[in-house]
Amino acid sequence: MTTQPLPRHHTFEKVAALQANVERVIRGKSEVVQFCIAALLARGHILLEDVPGVGKTTLAHALARSLSLSFQRIQFTSDLLPADIVGVTIYNQDAQEFEFVSGPVFTNILLADEINRATPKSQSALLEAMSEGMISVEKKRLPLPEPFLVLATQNPIEHVGTYPLPESQLDRFLMKLTIGYPNTIDEKKLLRSGGAHDALEHLEPVLEAQEVRDLQEQVSAIHMNESLVDYLMSIVHTTRTHAEAALGVSTRGALTYFKACQALAMVNGRDFVIPEDVKRLAGPVLSHRIVMKDRRLLRGDVTPEQRFIQRIVSEIPVPR
């Protein structure tokens, strides 16, 4: 079922208002905010990998408040059970029947905090819900609310007591992002203002759930010309055939890359994709989907996979 498209300028005004609203709380991180909004519009999910205390939870709260959507947070720990995520069936003595008590996954925006601290069984319960948009309970299929966005946070792999997500589950995330520390000027403003709490408390919604669903429907109408599709596919194909890569980008990864480029174009007020969209999203969308034969870490914050993607993008000719 398709929705009636909104007027073009109206569509872009709504998305711009959303970005501006979130940036009232998350300062100096415009690109991260843009990528998160693009993931939402593309019906994807986000893995935020960063050290504690840089604003991952605040970002999730700011998005939920800006969109007037329901929000839940799950703290993933080693003793978390799948039922703690999806819910549990209990016996109602008054009604003399079994009834399902829904878990926190039944929400619009879910913050899965420190997902790599839970066991693989609990991780899988969430990732199944992410991929299907439904929960299976007692031979029934229960749909999750729409829109549905998971922001999963993950501490860097070198932290003790974690269960790294396998490649097949990492592939479920549209983007893997890092917020990073703010620059000196923005951090000084944050100190002067007493933190982001007050700004978050006073944040008013700028979009309703139905408006978000309408925007999601319109993403597929964003145009990408044939030369750009070929450019995108050249990047994807190189990850599969390059001698340094043990595992390349899947077909699902290529599809989500295409959709993310359309969504980012919308976030930037365009009804067409440009080469810069494809280049900007290559790292966030593709780097967590590949495995390098040589996993030795390089100096700095860039992983071997990120460096590999950067090199591919720099070497493949950009269409004119």
What do the PLM-derived regions correspond to, one by one?
Residues H9-V54:
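Pre-Walker A (pre-P-loop) alpha-helix and adjacent loop at the N terminus of AAA/AAA+ ATPase modules
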Residues D50, D113-E114, A125:
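Walker B catalytic acidic pair
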Residues V51, I85, T153:
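P-loop (Walker A) phosphate-binding loop of NTP-binding proteins
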Residues T2-P5, H9, T241-R320:
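C-terminal engagement/docking regions of AAA+ P-loop ATPases
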Residues S66-D94:
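AAA+/P-loop NTPase substrate/partner-engagement loops
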Residues N92-E97, A118, S122, M130-L207, ...:
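Canonical AAA+ ATPase core
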Residues Q34-A38, Y91-L111, K140:
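Conserved alpha-helical scaffold flanking the Walker A/P-loop in AAA+ ATPase domains
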Residues L40-T77:
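Walker A/P-loop
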